[in-house]
Amino acid sequence: MTKRALISVSDKRGIVDLARELKHLGWDIISTGGTRLALEEAGVVTVAIDDVTGFPEMMDGRVKTLHPLIHGGLLARRDIEHHLQAAKQNRIELIDLVVVNLYPFKETICRSDITYDVAVDMVDIGGPSLLRSAAKNHASVTVVVDPTDYPLVLGELASTGSTSYQTRQSLAAKAFRHTAAYDAVIADYFTRQAGETKPEKLTLTYDLKQSMRYGENPQQAADFYQRALPITYSIASAKQLNGKELSFNNIRDADAAIRIIRDFKERPTVVALKHMNPCGIGQADDIETAWDFAYAADPVSIFGGIVVLNREVDLATAEKLHAIFLELIIAPSYSKEALAVLTHKKKHLRILELPFAAQEASEIEAEYTGVLGGLLVQNQDVVTESPADWIVVTKRQPNEQEMAALAFAWKTIKYVKSNAIIIANDHMTLGVGPGQTNRIASVRIAIAQATGQLEGAVLASDAFFPFADSIEEIAAAGIKAIIQPGGSIRDSESIAAADQHGITMIFTGVRHFRH
């Protein structure tokens, strides 16, 4: 009995060569619409789908493969006699191979000029149905959704006359992943269009971006996936100009770094980061000086760290970056001379280029945190804050220089692991106290790091001070300005301690925990 293949594809890469080989192996080919036209123009004889069903394609192609003579030929179990008898009685001929990929819904909705009606028309109905029917009956039917699998299938058909069960099972799993991902993108689009923010079902789809050597540690397997609908300002979308592949830890650190720099748009700024905590942030009127400040903030921790700059890297800055060991540099662009310097004798230095103009669009993306058996979803901590809404709760008011430093420190604090303390002036961080289980310990770490630079420095805390003991430590260090959310039942004690030591203190009313 002559074997039959059904071919209907949007992505026509390699389809003519596949069809020619199938014909050479003695297969009949059923095809539809544009696919059939492409094959016929290439000299491949096919059978029109409506010649099989007896019904013409109708409703602008919405109805063409949804027919018992097609799905019966796919779903009939070859090992069950009454299935075969039913097929024979109803003039259903078996179909042994399905080659289908779907209307380009994702690509369509990514275009800026697409209307809702056009998007709806790009929802494929018949294609997923064919794939699911064929994949369900993979014991007998081979289903192919990816042109890169054509050589595998043709090789087995040419060698043995059929595909192996292992191949059919693997391709069936791939087909189900394909249709699931396709439907997830559609569901996400319709959910957004309907304005729903808390759907009862959350379906996410990501595409494999990079197979990794290992995860956070060598004993952990890991891979890197990119959102099926990519966002531009993302490490997954960054252009790599030099260096080895990004590691698991590189990616996490780089993501933290580009989130921080996003809050510093107004002036040239450099962020140095290690283990997802900023170790130095500097801002100035030019990027070279901003780098000088970021480096001076902690020249020890920056060794082997990640640096992100929000302006083009020029030659002078590149020469300074080249002088120390860094894992990764990220910037919106690099001058030709700067790139030549950075890559000289540093083939392993990872250099990324990222479109900073797309920063704002990235702020609406949800954050997902996995827990055992569950997933936490939240908005990013990108609340708009204005110093006009802050309240000075002490007797002494901050002066202009202190106010600028407090605003700078407050931008920085939300990116430090809680309990978090930052000591800074108006252009650079001086001490970082991250991730301690009690706040006074973070205060002590930040003060110790900033020793010798505390003249005119200010301090920020990501959450309220539960006791006045931290204020006493801060006062003893000579710091005269504090910014914090407030909200403790003992706020009055902290305010009294600040007043006693002539410290000005601001309550912002906004907490910035980071775990």
From Swiss-Prot:
| Keywords, comma-separated and alphabetical | Hydrolase, Multifunctional enzyme, Purine biosynthesis, Transferase
Q: Name one GO biological process term.
A: 'de novo' IMP biosynthetic process
UniProt keyword annotation of Flavoprotein present: no
The record's section on PROSITE patterns has: MGS
Q: Which GO terms describe its cellular component?
A: cytosol
Any keyword Transport?
A: no
Q: Which InterPro entries does the protein's record reference?
A: AICAR_Tfase_dup_dom_sf, Cytidine_deaminase-like, MGS-like_dom, MGS-like_dom_sf, PurH-like
Q: Which GO terms describe its molecular function?
A: IMP cyclohydrolase activity; phosphoribosylaminoimidazolecarboxamide formyltransferase activity
**Catalysis performed (reactions):** (6R)-10-formyltetrahydrofolate + 5-amino-1-(5-phospho-beta-D-ribosyl)imidazole-4-carboxamide = 5-formamido-1-(5-phospho-D-ribosyl)imidazole-4-carboxamide + (6S)-5,6,7,8-tetrahydrofolate; IMP + H2O = 5-formamido-1-(5-phospho-D-ribosyl)imidazole-4-carboxamide
| Enzyme Commission number | 2.1.2.3, 3.5.4.10
Name the pathway: Purine metabolism; IMP biosynthesis via de novo pathway; 5-formamido-1-(5-phospho-D-ribosyl)imidazole-4-carboxamide from 5-amino-1-(5-phospho-D-ribosyl)imidazole-4-carboxamide (10-formyl THF route): step 1/1; Purine metabolism; IMP biosynthesis via de novo pathway; IMP from 5-formamido-1-(5-phospho-D-ribosyl)imidazole-4-carboxamide: step 1/1
Using the record's annotation, list all stretches that form the MGS-like domain.
1-145
Output the Pfam families linked to this UniProt entry.
AICARFT_IMPCHas, MGS
**Description of its domains:** The IMP cyclohydrolase activity resides in the N-terminal region.
Which family, according to UniProt? Belongs to the PurH family.
Protein's recorded name: Bifunctional purine biosynthesis protein PurH
Q: Which organism is it from?
A: Streptococcus equi subsp. zooepidemicus (strain H70)
* Gene that encodes it: purH
